[in-house]
Structure formats: C-alpha cells, structure tokens
C-alpha cells in the first residue's frame, strides 16, 4: 500500500519530526508505544491520542492488563486519551469496560481487549474529526480517597512465585503473566540441581476454590512441586 515506515532511534530527531510534519497528518494514533515528545504529538490538527488498556486513571503504565488480573480485578477496559507531557495522564476522550472472568489469563484478556480497542479507536477518530467530544481531565475524577493502582513494567524478579502468599494471589499472578512472560518457580531436584519452571495455568478446581475461599490450599500443586504456600 506504499505506506512509509519510520523507525527513528530518537523520536525528537529533527529529520523524523520534519518527515511527520511533511505528511500533514490530521490525527496520530498511538498504541503500545514509548512516550512521544511534544514536537511530534502536537503536529496533527485534530490531536494525537493513545489507546490504553485500562480504565484510566487506574493502571497507568506499561503493563495494565497484567496488573489488573494479578490484583484480582473483575473488570478493566480501554481508554482513548489525548497525549500530554506525562505518561497516561492526558484528558480522556472515550472509555469502554471489559469484563475479566475469574479464569481469564493475560492471553484471554488481550484477545478481548484487542477487539474492543480497535472499535474504540475508530469511534474516537470519528469523534475527533467531527469535534463531537468533551475531553475529561483525569484529575477531575481522582478523589481525595482514590487509590490509584499503578501498572509498571514487568520484571523477571516480579514473575517469581512467592509461596508465602495466599492461594488467590498465587493463582491471579499465574494467570496475569500467562503465557508471556510467565510466572516461574525454582525447585531443587534429588541430585541437588535447581530447576526453573514456568507455570502457565492452574487447574479449574483451584480456580473455583480460590474464587470462594482465600484459605484454600494449592494442595495437589504444592506437593508435586515441593512447595508450600501461606494458606
């Protein structure tokens, strides 16, 4: 389709900025990308908006879907918002909720959010070009008692299971990191070797137990793996 592909090392590079300016874009759409400098996001006449995988202002950051599942949320959503100088703090254009089932993994949620996000992006473009929207400043919906949940980048250390945690927390962590980057644990073999094992899912029975009772144990799993958890 003869669409130009630009991959600058530095987003504020003069040549890159001038190239974007020469394209004279009406709108710039950002999805899962690093922070754009003002020299870029201020170019389009209808603005630059981001498609973010949470109901902002909750879960600002690089891994909103992971952290929503890990924290046991039952809903999340997609937010489109106008870019500003900070990360995920711009004025909200549109939002749409997405249910998180108790058995949803990151992959399951991603597939649902992908469809909703695409539709919301198209609707947002239509509203921006028509001027049919009222941007909502995020600060106006953050109350004095609002506890904002962050969504920082997932580190390798974060992925290791802490068996001192309760069943629900362990279960949510496994599904919130599945399939990538995946939760893991280390076990020692009979000959003294230490193996690192990735865990992609737990049984449906554990899911049912964890949903109703935080004190239930991962009895079968912990025996097989040589681990015990807090419960």
What does each of the following model-derived ranges do?
Residues 1-181, 193:
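One-carbon transfer enzymes
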Residues 158, 162-231:
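An anion-binding loop in the catalytic cleft
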